[in-house]
Amino acid sequence: MAEHKNGVATNGYEKKSSPASSSTKSEAKPLPNGDKKDGIVKSFKQLRVASKRPLPKEMGDGSYRVVENRPGLKQDIRRLRGRDLKTLLEIVKAKVKGETQQDDKTMIMERTIQLVANLSDHSKVQESLTNSFISQLWNSIDHPPMLYMGDKFRFRQPDGSNNNPYLPQLGAARTPYSRTVRPKGMSLGAQPDPEAIFESVFARDAFRKNPNNVSSILWYWATIIIHDLFWTNLQDPNQNDSSSYLDLAPLYGSTEKDRDSIRTFKDGQLKPDCFADKRLIGNPPGVPILLIMFNRFHNHVATNLADINEGGRFSKPAEHLSPEAADAAWKKRDTELFETARLVTSGLYINITLIDYVRNIINLNRVDTTWTLDPRQEMGVSVGTKDLSESGTGNVVSAEFNLCYRWHSCLSEMDDKWVQDFYTELLGENYGPMNLQTMMKALKAFEASVADEPSERTFGGFKRGPDGKFNDDELVEALATAIEQPGGAFGGRNVPRIMKPIEMLGIMRGRKWNLAGLNEFRKHFGLKAYETFEDINSDPSVADALRNLYQHPDYVELYPGIVAEEAKTPMVPGVGIAPTYTISRVVLSDAVALVRGDRYYTTDYNPRHLTNWGYKEVDYDLKVNHGCVFYKLFLRAFPQHFKGNSVYAHYPMVIPSENKKILTNIKRADRFDFSRPEPTATRINIIGYNAAKYILEDQQKYRVCWEEGLKHLMGEAGGRFMLSGDTALHAQQRKCMGKLLYNDTWRNAVKSFYATTAEKLLAEKSYRLAGKMQVDVVRDVGNVAHTHFVARMFNLPLKTSENPKGVFSEQELYMILAVIFVCIFFDIDPAKSFPLRQGAREVAQKLGGIIEMNVKLANSIGVKGLFTSKPDKNDDPLARYGENMAKGLKKAGLSTEDIVWSQILPTAGAMVPNQAQVFAQTLDWYLSPAGEKYRPELARIAALETGDETDALLLGYAMEGIRMAGTFGLYREATGPDTIHEDDGRSIPVNAGDRVFVSFVQAAQDPKIFPNPGVVDPKRPLDKYIHYGVGPHACLGRDISQVALTELFRAVFRKKGVRRVPGAQGELKKVPRPGGFFVYMTEDWGSIWPFPTSMKITWDDGCGTDLFTLLFWCRSVPWWDLLPETTQAAPFIISSFQSQQIYSPAEIAAVLALMAFESGDFQYKRNHYPGRPGQGTANMQMPNYNLLYAKSIPELAKGWQGIESVEGLSDQELGDLLDDVTVDKYNFGSGPWFLKTQCKEDVRQAFKTDVDTGFQKYIEECVGTDLQPRLEYFQRAKTAFGL
């Protein structure tokens, strides 16, 4: 039989095997050269065919005409093998399902090659599949490429050039307008007078408001878009001085000079409250205010980009550079920050345009749907769309659309009045009739009135302050008023008369451009041409006017036609702003062209260019406001005026009263605040130690301000949580919970839990990478340990290996509790508040519902609960501790609702993230250069046996770490006027309602309280630390937190040479905030979060000194193989050493060596020879010791109560005793118990001086047996533990 390799016969052929040599049948394949006899027969047939051919007369050159006989479908089918059919079926299924991502692990590409290669050569099927394969390969890469490297293409150019790399001037500023429609028909030889057109079909006699109550803000937004796209050159009207892209040119300018005029050239910032395009000052104040909001948003973005410094893109220049090199580096950094901030800011601009603006245009804001018309939708081969609308190819705006976007009929009554007053301001009273001459005079006056320097410009009567900014109160007042003003309606006879000369110019401009007429324009977009004037507008007066002006609908000009057209009636959804018929269709086409053609909003719009944080900062979430993001702009620009859920900020494009109806109809009104925006309470920062104590200890003058957040999440019961208020009820709640938290057994239960859990998590979550142990000590240890704690104590549905039916994973439950905490105690970022509160309420209700169900089950029928672990309460002191707490709350008279919503859930939420943060910040400081010198001492203390002295010392170091690195503070609200005397001598007046923020950062460095504050002193008095708060609302869980922190520190610093992993993953990614505070980045660096999220540490190879490392990571040594079913035995062994507080590697090695020897390498739990009744366990203890051992175990003690000796016990009774103590969780604990309880102190002390001496004393004096037979096992254990 042929030799096989990997299941395929060598060389692809297989010789025939005779029946005698093979027991399996195989298809015979001929050898390549075939059989000699068959070749002769075939050659003869070919000669016979050739002899029958006619003479070659057809071609003229004496040759035969070649006729190619291609193999047919039948031949291809015959050649298909079973695996080929399977491949073909998979290809067809993928096509039908529209799958675009191949699983290359299935080798589908290679199997396709096999399929095609096996078909008949040159068959049509083979050719078709080959062509399809080549097309797929070809289409995987752009031809030619449209994306290029380098700043020239990465950043927007001031004039909009290079949007299309192959046509760099396509759509650039100062290039000609395009023409959308080719004019084919003839127009009237004598066109009607523009003034007559205005007076008859344009002019507003009485204001008609928009039928959908669209506010003036939408028209302000449209004004920005219009000025972004159109700026007709005065000397050459065919030229557009703006780019054809929505690049926010009104803010940034369309020339390098304009762009530079608003830059500070420092840190990528813009000059305060400036914008480049002076034309916008000639619009109602709301328009420039929107641009100022974008200015502020840009500076917010630039600041955060620099602070986050993703990938080192915005690092400050090195100090050693020459002055010239440093100057160049600073300039490059400024440019990088400015241009990246522009990309991000423009991203928000386009998202507001495509979501908020377009949703209102087509009335999607009135329905509960997340569907949106986003032109950036991916299509084409990559996503399985057959017909491709290309993207990122560029755009050129047309002259027709220059006229289509003149929406002057939409001016509100207020803005009509403003324009009139503006002309009066420019020209004075009694300036005469409003005509072209008057308008040109006004334009000249306007041009002269606007300063060349953007930072000196003013508008709307607003004045700049010393910092260059306008007064926020005045800007917000103007904005709120505009939001409340409905705009005008589309349709004939609604253009304010003050706009007459501008409209006349528009008519004249359309004629000079020789644009197609209204009907030609409509037909181009697939709309039916108007046949009568009544089709254009059913209002008889408008139809008659048009008839008298134009004679026939085909003669109606484009601009007069689209202004005079009838407006659509609102439709839900479909028609929102109620535009005229033609406008409603063409504006959507233009929106798609503008956005889809813009490379910076499509193919180059990604986190790599905007940074992860920048991309996410402006991205929309369809779960929040159906994707609307206008609130991000409002709340970043005016964080002290708009509430996080203000309807004025979230839906400013519709007047508030109409929004109330809309949101009520879609059942969302309860999420929003409908009050007018007003300045929020003043925040007063207090930094002194004594001032902090003064505020926190006087709850009459300074009350807690967490009730609203608690009620939002927990309902009315949340208002009864101890931290919700300052009444006698809240004090009683605190007293009750404190009594239940700190019972007689709390310290041992908490200490044992954290000691075991810390080591368990370090073992389970760590991994070996490049020869070193690593673990994410924040995400997978610190955060998770506290999550396990509250889950065990409050019986929460945590999914673990022990409780696989739990509902929430470790990370999910931690995040739920963190979100709850932030929503209640740290909801200080208005721009993030709304989505945070909505998400927090959803998860809090879900978790609270499960807890409430379980509490009811436990109180009614005694069931532990659904989806929770079922530990034996006698074997789980923490669970028993938590159960007693719940019973105590019930006994105190609390209802199930109160137990859950005013106690368990808020307490869990308050405990976990705060304690996790304490651990992360403290550990981070000791791993930093500042704390490095203290690490050897921490490692020494952590290696010692636990005890009051070592615990106090370890806690002292932890508390000092918090003092050095902790960023903690608390808010209080002043109940009345007061004066706070700061530690530095300042007197700070306070008024009722002021929010006072007490910072502990500077207070922790007060030399009067902490002498030598820059030095770590682990023996400082604990009562001096105030980062847990002081006064009636001091952290109730402080003592628990300190025990937990001590055990976490012990577990981490037992690791040999513990340190950060190299690079960014070893750093706690922080973003600085004023006052010495920090916030943190999520792991993807896409969002800022109040709590640490990730930091990886490593430690040296070797067994180390902690139990889990000893027992899990030293597997290469022989003794490990002695453990039976290690995954089951190890936890019990570790738990027993932990419970007996044995941490010395020498003692652990000795006990394990003895147990392995006595149990015959853990094969036996009972005495095998001579078969002594009652003798057994892994430690092979005599019956009298097993009785003592059983009585030391709470759940076994009751069964042996009253029996003081094994004397007189029957063999059956001795067997029962042995059955009890040889259950795995007790069997492997016998050795540690024996050492701890039966050996004298001098034996254990001997291990500390000399390992071998200690083992000898242990075997001979304590166990009382021969040393020599047991030395081999001890030597193996010593080798394993590096002793």
UniProtKB/Swiss-Prot annotation:
Heme binds at C1035. This is Bifunctional dioxygenase (DOX)-epoxy alcohol synthase (EAS). It comes from Fusarium oxysporum (strain Fo5176) (Fusarium vascular wilt). Its EC number is 1.13.11.-, 1.13.11.62, 1.-.-.-. CDD domains: CYP_LDS-like_C, linoleate_diol_synthase_like. Bifunctional dioxygenase (DOX)-epoxy alcohol synthase (EAS) that converts linoleic acid (18:2n-6) sequentially to 10(R)-hydroperoxy-8(E),12(Z)-octadecadienoic acid (10R-HPODE) and 10R-HPODE further to 12(13)-epoxy-10-hydroxy-8(E)-octa-decenoic acid as the end product. Linoleic acid is oxidized mainly to the R stereoisomer of 10-HPODE. It catalyses: (9Z,12Z)-octadecadienoate + O2 = (8E,10R,12Z)-10-hydroperoxyoctadeca-8,12-dienoate; (8E,10R,12Z)-10-hydroperoxyoctadeca-8,12-dienoate = (12S,13R)-epoxy-(10R)-hydroxy-(8E)-octadecenoate; (9Z)-octadecenoate + O2 = (8R)-hydroperoxy-(9Z)-octadecenoate. The lineage of its organism: Eukaryota, Fungi, Dikarya, Ascomycota, Pezizomycotina. Keywords: Dioxygenase, Heme, Iron, Metal-binding, Oxidoreductase. Residues 130-476 are annotated as: Fatty acid alpha-dioxygenase. Heme b binds at H227, H408. One of its GO terms (molecular function) is heme binding.
